[in-house]
Structures are given as structure tokens and as C-alpha cells.
Amino acid sequence: MKHLVIRNLGPLKEADIELKRINVIIGPQSSGKSCVLKTACYCTWVEKRIELTQTADFFAKGNNFLNELERFHKLKGYIKDDTFISYESDYMMFSYDNATKTFLFNWKNDRWKYRRSKVTYIPAERNLVAAIPNWFEVKFADDNIRDFMADWETARQSTTHNLPVLNLGVLYHYDANTKSDKVQTADGVTLDFTNTSSGLQSLIPMFVHLNYLSVVQVGKSDNSSVTGNKEKIDLTKLVYDYFSPLFGEKVIEDIGGKRSSVVLEINGEAYSMQRSDIKKMDDIISQYIVTDHCDIFLEEPEANLFPPTQSSVVEWLLAMTTGEQYNNLFVATHSPYILNSFLEKKNIPMTLLYTRMSEGQMVIRTATEEDIQGIYDFGVDAFFNIESLG
């Protein structure tokens, strides 16, 4: 389980939350939902970068930690003099206090049990890829929208077959010859993606992207590029440098003859190691190279969708999250249909968060089991009676 604390960021006075496999946050517009979603996404990415490089030096330097958050997630004007963020998982703990310009970091005992994830932020503006036919020719800032567009480009080019979109009777595919997106509607008519309904223009980018991640990318190693190969080389050196002195026995002199062990030279020192220990190190490297799961941060999955379709989206998200291949999901929503569809599912590891005004400032609260049961059993409308929660 992850623990996230945010103080004095944008409209938020405080958020102190435990994150589970599935997390849903509700609240009025401009109340801090996206601040929480973006910060949780950012901290998950920071954790990944620290694990893959085995150092927090970049984020500890100057104001890099907050600068990267502000740049990537478009939070200019949200950072305050006393902004504070802390994050803790099974692998590490880090925090940044803007009042003292202090970044603190500690490894946890499970440091080397980390498994690589694909961290993805799906913005509410995802329909831009349909609304702007030549979006790939437009220069965008290097932020979460541009990052999603890059991921969309990879996903669409990999979807050259007809992909059924939920249970809508709609098929999507990418035409490599014309470099365009095609959608076959329920009545058999094929349209350019830019000419489809607003609902499909919001749904298809999310659906195709997440389908690609869950079906294609999970289980793949990131060594197909120069960057990926360099990362693997660097990680191999980091792991061998760290574990060889722990697993191996330093060789003082070469006694000759046959050995049951293998001698490795690490940083000018020779270590005699069992093959089983070498396998342990190679397994750790594999955990860092091969994508194990996805950490999905999703804004407004309900955008422009009819209520029954919203429920179908939740069914699909849950199947992808709690099925044979687990993923982590964090959703920000304004829709009671999205919320109720999540709450209908019993025995899933879910946290429901909501924003609330306290002493003139916004705070984040976690709904109690009683709150959740009341919403589900008695039809309490959490969106109109949010002040009754907690």
C-alpha cells in the first residue's frame, strides 16, 4: 500500500491518504481532485526513476522535484512557498518541503523487490487526437498531454486489426497506408475518426491506449531502443556492483583447478560466486527491465458518454485491473454512474476519496465503510450530499 501526503498545493490545504489497487476521487470542479491525481502519478513516476537508476540525486538537487511536477502536469501557479509532498511505498520513502527546500529520501527493506511498471496519465483532453487531424504536426509543450499523444501514437500504429470497442458494436483500426484512424460504426459505415461522435472521440483514445498497454506492452522488456539498451547495461552494472560483494567471496589468489563457482571481476575485485546467486541477480535485473504492470491515472472516464456506456467502461477497467494481470488504477470523476459502478463491485481493494471544505480550505478525506455502504444501499447521492460523508 502507498501513503501520500500533500499540503498546500493549489486549492488543497491537506491530503493524507492510503492508496490501494483501485482509487476513486470525487468532488466539485476546482476542488483539488486533479492535484491529487497528478501528484500521485508523479510520485509513482519518481519512484520508478529512482529504482531504475538506484539514486535520488536528481530530485534532491535544487528545486528539481517540484519543477518537474509543475512542468509535466501543468501546475504553474499551484506551487506555494510551504508546499509539502511525501510518498511512501514498500520500496522507499521520499518527501519535499518547499519551505526549507529539503528533499529527504530513504530506502525501505523491499528496495530490490520493485517490479517495473508503465506509469500512464490519461488526461481529460485526450480527444485532441481526434479533434485535431494533424495533431502530430502541432508543437505541444512537453507535458502530460504530449506524453499521452506519444503513447497514443504507439498504440494506434499497433492496432491495424479491427478492435471491438466495449460492447458498442463499434470497431477501430489504424490504416497504415493512409496513416489515419478508421472507425466502423454499428450500422457498418466506416468513418474517419475525426468525424465520429464526441463520445467515441473521448472513449477510443483511452480504450485503444489501455488495450495496448494491457495486451501488448505488459511482459515486454524495454530494450528495443538505444535508451532501453543503455538502461539495461546500467542496471546490470548497478545490480552486480551491489550484490556481488554480498553474495560472493572475494578471491585473494587464483588457486587454479576446476571451480563449481564463477569468478566475476567487479570494480577491480574478483569474487567467487555460485551460479544460483548469479541467477538471483539476473532475476532482479529482469524485474526492472520487463514491464510487470501498469499504474493508470485517469481523468473523467465518463466524458461525453451515455450512462450505460459509462458502466461498461468501469466493467472493462475492473476486468483489466483485477483480472489475471493486475494493474493499479486511480480515477477522478464527476459521474455518479461511474462511482456507483465501482461501488457495486464487492470485495475489491478500493479507496474512495472526496474533497471537502474545512475552515475555508479544501482537504481530502477517505470515505468510511459506512459512507460507502450508505451510498450503495440507500442511494445517497454523494455528489449532492458530499458534506454528509465522513
Please give the residue ranges for each predicted region.
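Walker B catalytic acidic pair
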Residues: 299-301
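Phosphate-coordinating catalytic segments in nucleotide- and nucleic-acid-processing enzymes
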Residues: 18, 40, 44-296, 344, ...
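Conserved D-loop-proximal element of ABC-family nucleotide-binding domains
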Residues: 306-307
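Loop/turn-to-beta-strand initiation segments
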Residues: 293, 325-330
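H-loop/switch region of ABC-family ATPase nucleotide-binding domains
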Residues: 332-334
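RecA-like P-loop NTPase motor core
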Residues: 81, 110-113, 318-325, 337-390
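Conserved hydrophobic alpha-helix in the ABC-type ATPase nucleotide-binding domain
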Residues: 312-317
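Pre-Walker A-like glycine/lysine-rich segment at the N-terminus of P-loop NTPase domains
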Residues: 1-42
